[in-house]
């Protein structure tokens, strides 16, 4: 739209998350949103409802959180959570942020029918890893109503099947938090990605295939959440809390 013109595009984000633990986004979620905006050509990034947002989870550290939003260079090495947009419990908030634009999630899983979900990130993880800066990269899916021991899944990232030795499953069936029951009936499939499986800058694709479904269960399985979590070291060979005794 702005090619060969003097116009610039400014990206913006709201501060409504409406998840089970946090109504407002955390710093890592905002940093990821801003990084994606810059990566797609935005000249600046802002929060469009900052004035009336009095319950932000980062108010106590506001300067440290807001400062990186002004520059893609400052954002390059900060921790991020790239969360695929979903439909919040309150549908009037429009999970995409734009009325009329359908959120990507949730998606239903049917046996033998793959679901492809776009996941956009801005980080050049291979470059940062060559500098020794990458601490951990995790791909996380929250699956609803699915019992891992009774159902077989195949999960791929950019056409590479993620092996089970990278997988850790967390059962949320009976998990309570101060806000109440946390995602009852859900399982978190978390892959701690090796460098060969790192997502690339730009659009990536996560494909989830239900290979075999428990024949004794007549209930819809869903992909409820999908995110990529990235943590960095301040510099090579640096750990924040290395002394254990």
Predicted segments — roles?
Residues 144-238:
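Beta-strand-rich ligand-recognition modules
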Residues 1-116, 121-131, 146-151, 155-158, ...:
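Glycan-processing catalytic domains of CAZymes
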Residues 238-245:
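Acidic, serine/threonine- and proline-rich intrinsically disordered appendage/tail regions
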Residues 135-137:
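Structural beta-strand segments of beta-rich domains
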Residues 139-141:
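Amphipathic protein-protein interaction modules
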């Amino acid at each position: 739209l702005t090619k060969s013109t003097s116009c610039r595009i400014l990206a913006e984000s709201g501060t409504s998350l409406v998840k089970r633990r946090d109504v407002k986004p955390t710093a890592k979620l905002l940093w990821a949103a801003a990084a994606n905006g810059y990566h797609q050509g935005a000249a600046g990034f802002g929060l469009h409802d900052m004035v009336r947002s009095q319950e932000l989870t980062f108010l106590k550290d506001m300067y440290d959180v807001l400062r990186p939003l002004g520059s893609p260079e400052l954002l390059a090495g900060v921790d991020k959570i790239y969360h695929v947009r979903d439909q919040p419990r309150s549908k009037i908030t429009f999970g995409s942020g734009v009325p009329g634009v359908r959120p990507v999630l949730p998606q239903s899983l049917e046996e033998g029918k793959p679901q492809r979900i776009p996941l956009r990130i801005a980080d050049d993880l291979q470059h940062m890893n060559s500098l020794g800066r990458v601490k951990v990269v995790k791909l996380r899916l929250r699956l609803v109503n699915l019992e891992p021991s009774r159902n077989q899944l195949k999960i791929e990232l950019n056409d590479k099947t993620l092996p089970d030795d990278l997988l850790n499953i967390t059962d949320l069936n009976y998990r309570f938090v101060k806000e109440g029951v946390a995602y009852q009936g859900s399982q978190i499939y978390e892959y701690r990605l090796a460098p060969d499986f790192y997502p690339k800058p730009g659009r990536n694709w996560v494909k989830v295939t239900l290979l075999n479904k428990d024949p004794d269960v007549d209930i819809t399985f869903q992909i409820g959440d999908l995110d990529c979590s990235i943590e960095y070291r301040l510099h090579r060979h640096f750990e924040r809390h290395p002394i254990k005794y």
